[in-house]
Regions:
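N-terminal signal-anchor transmembrane alpha helix
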Residues: 2-29
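Nucleotide and nucleotide-moiety/phosphate-recognizing core
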Residues: 5, 9, 55-61, 66-101, ...
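Hydrophobic alpha-helical transmembrane segments
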Residues: 7-12, 57, 85-90, 125-130, ...
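Alpha-helical transmembrane segments of multi-pass membrane proteins
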Residues: 13-18, 92-96, 132, 136, ...
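C-terminal ends of transmembrane helices
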Residues: 22-27, 95-105, 132-139
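Cytosolic, membrane-interface loops and tails of multi-pass inner-membrane proteins
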Residues: 23-56
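Short, non-helical or kinked segments that cap or interrupt transmembrane helices
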Residues: 32-43, 101-114, 141-149
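Interfacial segments of multi-pass membrane proteins
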Residues: 48-51, 74-78, 95, 109-139, ...
Length: 173
């Protein structure tokens, strides 16, 4: 695969990742700009704290789903080329964090990263979720659970023998 194809898959991922699900869903359902409330973040944690669980679950699913969709498109169009999928994944994550629709501002990438982990490394994502849940239940800090879960991802990717590019993605995502 040539360099232009990597750029293409990165761009596809970036556009999908740029969709500000939290902002648009909260605006559509509740008529408010979520960036004016709580932590001012558009992610599901701030949505949960500001407008409640139902909308937060929708935001979480959309943020996770947009990364998965970008990678699935790359997978189906390239016959499963791992590098195309990873470039789409990196694009989706960076698009979420630096959204085209929000002047290159965005979320923290936790839900989008989770969706990418679920698709690319299902065993790893399941264990990371259990670790995240245990930390959140024990401390009531979602951010701490997210950080510990993110730290576990590359360790588990290495342990389960995922290919080096997937391990590196887990390490930097």
């Amino acid at each position: 695969m040539d360099v232009m194809m990597f750029v293409l898959w990165f761009a596809v991922g970036f556009v999908f990742g740029s969709v500000p699900s939290g902002l648009w869903l909260v605006k559509a359902i509740h008529g408010i700009d979520i960036r004016e409330y709580g932590s001012k973040n558009i992610g599901s944690t701030n949505v949960f704290r500001t407008v409640g669980g139902k909308t937060a679950v929708l935001v979480l699913l959309c943020d996770a789903g947009k990364g998965i969709i970008a990678v699935m498109i790359a997978q189906s169009m390239t016959g499963g080329d791992l590098y195309a999928m990873l470039f789409a994944a990196i694009g989706a994550l960076l698009g979420h964090n630096y959204s085209l629709f929000l002047g290159f501002k965005g979320g923290r990438g936790v839900a989008t990263g989770l969706g990418l982990l679920i698709f690319l490394m299902p065993k790893v994502s399941g264990i990371c979720f259990i670790v995240w849940l245990a930390i959140v239940l024990a401390t009531r800090y979602v951010s701490l659970g997210s950080c510990v879960g993110a730290f576990c991802a590359p360790c588990l990717a290495w342990y389960f023998g995922y290919p080096l590019p997937v391990f590196l993605f887990a390490a930097v995502a």
